[in-house]
Protein backbone atom coordinates (compact mmCIF):
# COMPACT_ATOMS: atom_id res chain seq x y z
CA UNK A 1 0.00 0.00 0.00
CA UNK A 2 1.19 3.50 -0.78
CA UNK A 3 -0.02 7.06 -0.75
CA UNK A 4 -2.16 9.05 1.62
CA UNK A 5 -4.25 6.11 2.84
CA UNK A 6 -1.12 4.26 3.92
CA UNK A 7 0.16 7.39 5.65
CA UNK A 8 -3.09 7.56 7.59
CA UNK A 9 -2.67 3.95 8.68
CA UNK A 10 0.86 4.63 9.87
CA UNK A 11 -0.27 7.75 11.70
CA UNK A 12 -3.08 5.85 13.39
CA UNK A 13 -0.84 2.98 14.44
CA UNK A 14 1.65 5.31 16.07
CA UNK A 15 -0.87 7.69 17.59
CA UNK A 16 0.37 10.69 15.66
CA UNK A 17 -1.18 13.39 13.51
CA UNK A 18 -0.61 14.52 9.98
CA UNK A 19 -0.76 18.28 10.55
CA UNK A 20 2.58 20.11 10.58
CA UNK A 21 4.53 16.85 10.74
CA UNK A 22 8.18 16.04 10.86
CA UNK A 23 8.53 13.11 8.49
CA UNK A 24 11.38 10.72 8.12
CA UNK A 25 11.96 7.77 5.88
CA UNK A 26 11.72 4.18 6.95
CA UNK A 27 10.96 0.86 5.33
CA UNK A 28 9.14 -2.34 6.17
CA UNK A 29 8.68 -5.48 4.11
CA UNK A 30 10.36 -3.79 1.18
CA UNK A 31 7.96 -0.83 1.19
CA UNK A 32 9.47 2.60 1.79
CA UNK A 33 7.20 5.16 3.37
CA UNK A 34 7.27 8.29 5.47
CA UNK A 35 6.70 7.81 9.16
CA UNK A 36 4.99 10.83 10.63
CA UNK A 37 5.75 12.45 13.97
CA UNK A 38 3.43 15.11 15.31
CA UNK A 39 5.09 18.44 16.01
CA UNK A 40 2.14 20.74 16.61
CA UNK A 41 0.40 19.71 19.80
CA UNK A 42 -3.10 19.80 18.37
CA UNK A 43 -4.60 17.95 15.45
CA UNK A 44 -8.22 18.95 15.85
CA UNK A 45 -9.88 21.72 17.84
CA UNK A 46 -12.64 20.05 19.82
CA UNK A 47 -14.69 22.03 22.31
CA UNK A 48 -15.59 19.48 24.98
CA UNK A 49 -17.65 21.97 26.96
CA UNK A 50 -20.37 21.59 24.33
CA UNK A 51 -19.94 17.85 23.77
CA UNK A 52 -23.50 16.39 23.71
CA UNK A 53 -22.55 12.81 24.48
CA UNK A 54 -22.74 9.90 24.71
CA UNK A 55 -20.41 9.71 27.65
CA UNK A 56 -18.69 12.43 29.61
CA UNK A 57 -16.18 14.93 28.20
CA UNK A 58 -13.36 13.09 29.97
CA UNK A 59 -14.39 9.80 28.39
CA UNK A 60 -14.55 11.47 24.99
CA UNK A 61 -11.12 12.99 25.51
CA UNK A 62 -9.64 9.60 26.35
CA UNK A 63 -11.23 8.02 23.30
CA UNK A 64 -9.96 10.74 21.01
CA UNK A 65 -6.42 10.47 22.33
CA UNK A 66 -6.29 6.76 21.55
CA UNK A 67 -6.76 7.71 17.91
CA UNK A 68 -4.10 10.42 17.96
CA UNK A 69 -6.52 13.33 18.31
CA UNK A 70 -5.65 16.15 20.68
CA UNK A 71 -8.07 18.33 22.60
CA UNK A 72 -6.96 21.95 22.41
CA UNK A 73 -9.35 23.64 24.80
CA UNK A 74 -12.65 23.30 26.62
CA UNK A 75 -14.33 26.34 25.13
CA UNK A 76 -13.52 30.03 25.00
CA UNK A 77 -12.31 32.43 22.36
CA UNK A 78 -10.55 30.74 19.41
CA UNK A 79 -8.20 33.73 19.26
CA UNK A 80 -6.57 32.50 22.46
CA UNK A 81 -5.21 29.41 20.74
CA UNK A 82 -1.44 29.21 20.31
CA UNK A 83 -0.17 31.25 17.40
CA UNK A 84 1.29 29.11 14.63
CA UNK A 85 4.35 31.33 14.33
CA UNK A 86 5.10 30.96 18.04
CA UNK A 87 4.77 27.19 17.76
CA UNK A 88 6.95 27.05 14.69
CA UNK A 89 9.73 28.92 16.43
CA UNK A 90 9.28 27.23 19.79
CA UNK A 91 8.37 30.42 21.63
CA UNK A 92 5.45 29.01 23.60
CA UNK A 93 4.88 26.24 26.12
CA UNK A 94 2.35 23.94 24.45
CA UNK A 95 -0.05 22.18 26.81
CA UNK A 96 0.21 18.66 25.41
CA UNK A 97 3.07 18.36 22.90
CA UNK A 98 6.10 16.24 23.69
CA UNK A 99 8.36 19.19 22.80
CA UNK A 100 8.32 22.96 23.05
CA UNK A 101 11.26 23.64 20.71
CA UNK A 102 9.15 24.23 17.59
CA UNK A 103 9.37 23.04 14.02
CA UNK A 104 12.44 25.04 13.01
CA UNK A 105 14.61 23.64 15.79
CA UNK A 106 13.23 20.15 15.26
CA UNK A 107 14.25 20.42 11.63
CA UNK A 108 17.74 21.37 12.83
CA UNK A 109 17.84 18.20 14.93
CA UNK A 110 16.52 16.10 12.06
CA UNK A 111 19.15 17.49 9.70
CA UNK A 112 21.98 16.91 12.17
CA UNK A 113 20.93 13.34 12.94
CA UNK A 114 20.52 12.57 9.24
CA UNK A 115 24.02 13.88 8.55
CA UNK A 116 25.50 11.79 11.34
CA UNK A 117 23.77 8.65 10.09
CA UNK A 118 24.44 9.23 6.39
CA UNK A 119 28.12 10.09 6.91
CA UNK A 120 28.81 7.45 9.55
CA UNK A 121 30.00 9.87 12.22
CA UNK A 122 30.51 7.65 15.28
CA UNK A 123 28.86 8.10 18.63
CA UNK A 124 25.62 8.20 20.56
CA UNK A 125 23.05 11.00 20.75
CA UNK A 126 22.21 12.94 23.90
CA UNK A 127 20.00 15.79 25.00
CA UNK A 128 20.61 17.41 28.38
CA UNK A 129 17.31 18.88 29.49
CA UNK A 130 14.50 16.99 27.76
CA UNK A 131 11.20 18.30 29.20
CA UNK A 132 8.64 15.76 27.89
CA UNK A 133 11.18 13.99 25.71
CA UNK A 134 10.12 15.10 22.23
CA UNK A 135 13.57 15.78 20.79
CA UNK A 136 15.00 12.51 22.06
CA UNK A 137 11.94 10.64 20.79
CA UNK A 138 12.66 12.07 17.35
CA UNK A 139 16.32 11.02 17.65
CA UNK A 140 15.35 7.47 18.58
CA UNK A 141 12.79 7.32 15.80
CA UNK A 142 15.40 8.30 13.24
CA UNK A 143 17.75 5.57 14.45
CA UNK A 144 14.95 3.11 13.85
CA UNK A 145 14.18 4.55 10.44
CA UNK A 146 17.82 4.26 9.36
CA UNK A 147 18.10 0.76 10.81
CA UNK A 148 20.81 1.79 13.29
CA UNK A 149 20.78 -0.70 16.16
CA UNK A 150 24.11 0.24 17.75
CA UNK A 151 23.79 3.86 18.83
CA UNK A 152 22.06 4.88 22.01
CA UNK A 153 19.96 7.91 22.81
CA UNK A 154 20.73 9.38 26.22
CA UNK A 155 17.91 11.21 27.99
CA UNK A 156 19.47 13.43 30.66
CA UNK A 157 17.38 15.51 33.04
CA UNK A 158 16.75 16.13 36.71
CA UNK A 159 13.09 15.33 35.97
CA UNK A 160 12.38 17.85 38.74
CA UNK A 161 12.57 21.07 36.75
CA UNK A 162 15.49 23.50 36.85
CA UNK A 163 17.69 24.13 39.88
CA UNK A 164 17.43 27.37 41.80
CA UNK A 165 20.24 29.70 40.69
CA UNK A 166 23.46 29.39 42.68
CA UNK A 167 24.36 33.04 42.26
CA UNK A 168 27.44 32.91 44.47
CA UNK A 169 29.14 30.46 42.13
CA UNK A 170 27.30 31.42 38.94
CA UNK A 171 26.40 35.13 39.18
CA UNK A 172 25.23 35.19 35.56
CA UNK A 173 22.19 33.15 36.63
CA UNK A 174 20.96 35.93 38.93
CA UNK A 175 17.44 37.01 38.07
CA UNK A 176 16.69 33.86 36.10
CA UNK A 177 15.00 31.67 38.70
CA UNK A 178 12.42 29.38 37.10
CA UNK A 179 12.98 26.53 39.55
CA UNK A 180 9.40 26.70 40.80
CA UNK A 181 7.69 26.51 37.41
CA UNK A 182 5.57 23.37 37.61
CA UNK A 183 5.19 23.13 33.81
CA UNK A 184 8.89 22.31 33.58
CA UNK A 185 8.68 19.51 36.16
CA UNK A 186 8.07 16.41 34.06
CA UNK A 187 8.88 13.11 35.74
CA UNK A 188 10.96 10.35 34.19
CA UNK A 189 7.99 7.97 34.18
CA UNK A 190 6.01 10.40 32.03
CA UNK A 191 8.88 10.74 29.56
CA UNK A 192 9.19 6.95 29.38
CA UNK A 193 5.46 6.75 28.71
CA UNK A 194 5.86 9.26 25.87
CA UNK A 195 8.58 7.10 24.30
CA UNK A 196 6.42 4.03 24.76
CA UNK A 197 3.44 5.67 23.06
CA UNK A 198 5.51 5.79 19.87
CA UNK A 199 6.82 2.25 20.35
CA UNK A 200 10.34 3.58 20.88
CA UNK A 201 11.11 2.71 24.50
CA UNK A 202 13.79 0.04 24.33
CA UNK A 203 17.39 -0.78 25.25
CA UNK A 204 18.73 1.89 22.91
CA UNK A 205 17.16 4.56 25.13
CA UNK A 206 19.09 5.29 28.33
CA UNK A 207 17.92 7.63 31.06
CA UNK A 208 20.31 9.70 33.18
CA UNK A 209 18.23 10.90 36.11
CA UNK A 210 19.52 13.64 38.39
CA UNK A 211 21.27 16.99 38.37
CA UNK A 212 23.86 17.23 35.61
CA UNK A 213 26.71 17.82 38.05
CA UNK A 214 25.92 14.49 39.69
CA UNK A 215 25.28 12.32 36.63
CA UNK A 216 27.06 13.40 33.47
CA UNK A 217 30.69 13.12 34.53
CA UNK A 218 30.08 9.50 35.53
CA UNK A 219 27.77 8.53 32.68
CA UNK A 220 28.98 5.47 30.72
CA UNK A 221 29.13 7.40 27.45
CA UNK A 222 32.18 6.67 25.33
CA UNK A 223 31.55 8.80 22.25
CA UNK A 224 28.92 11.25 21.04
CA UNK A 225 27.85 12.20 17.55
CA UNK A 226 25.31 14.75 18.77
CA UNK A 227 25.31 16.74 22.00
CA UNK A 228 22.21 18.89 22.39
CA UNK A 229 22.20 21.25 25.36
CA UNK A 230 18.91 22.60 26.71
CA UNK A 231 19.64 23.62 30.27
CA UNK A 232 18.79 27.34 30.11
CA UNK A 233 21.06 28.43 32.96
CA UNK A 234 24.79 29.12 33.03
CA UNK A 235 25.23 26.41 35.66
CA UNK A 236 23.22 23.74 33.85
CA UNK A 237 24.85 24.51 30.51
CA UNK A 238 28.34 24.34 32.00
CA UNK A 239 27.62 21.19 34.01
CA UNK A 240 26.67 19.43 30.77
CA UNK A 241 29.18 20.93 28.36
CA UNK A 242 32.35 20.44 30.41
CA UNK A 243 32.15 16.63 30.86
CA UNK A 244 30.61 15.87 27.46
CA UNK A 245 32.25 18.15 24.91
CA UNK A 246 35.46 16.11 24.77
CA UNK A 247 33.40 13.05 23.83
CA UNK A 248 31.97 14.61 20.65
CA UNK A 249 33.42 12.98 17.54
CA UNK A 250 35.08 15.02 14.78
CA UNK A 251 32.28 15.99 12.44
CA UNK A 252 29.70 15.68 15.20
CA UNK A 253 27.30 18.36 16.36
CA UNK A 254 26.95 20.47 19.49
CA UNK A 255 23.53 22.11 19.47
CA UNK A 256 22.75 24.79 22.06
CA UNK A 257 19.01 25.34 22.30
CA UNK A 258 19.04 28.51 24.41
CA UNK A 259 22.06 30.36 22.98
CA UNK A 260 19.91 32.94 21.22
CA UNK A 261 17.28 33.38 23.92
CA UNK A 262 18.84 33.01 27.38
CA UNK A 263 21.74 35.27 28.27
CA UNK A 264 23.10 32.96 31.02
CA UNK A 265 23.33 30.12 28.50
CA UNK A 266 24.98 32.34 25.90
CA UNK A 267 27.52 33.52 28.47
CA UNK A 268 28.33 29.95 29.50
CA UNK A 269 29.02 28.95 25.90
CA UNK A 270 31.08 32.07 25.17
CA UNK A 271 33.15 31.56 28.32
CA UNK A 272 33.76 27.91 27.47
CA UNK A 273 34.91 28.79 23.97
CA UNK A 274 37.23 31.47 25.34
CA UNK A 275 38.74 29.04 27.83
CA UNK A 276 39.18 26.28 25.27
Question: What name fits each language-model region?
Answer:
Residues 1-6, 12, 20, 62, ...:
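Short, intrinsically disordered, charge-balanced linker/junction segments flanking boundaries
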Residues 4, 21, 46-48, 78, ...:
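Short linear motifs in intrinsically disordered/low-complexity regions
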Residues 14, 28-44, 57, 61, ...:
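S-adenosylmethionine/decaboxylated-SAM
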Residues 17, 25:
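Alpha-helical ligand/cofactor-binding cores
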Residues 23, 48-50, 62, 71:
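Class I S-adenosyl-L-methionine
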Residues 105-108:
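N-terminal pre-P-loop "Q-motif" helix
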Residues 111:
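Short internal alpha-helix immediately C-terminal to a glycine-rich phosphate-binding loop
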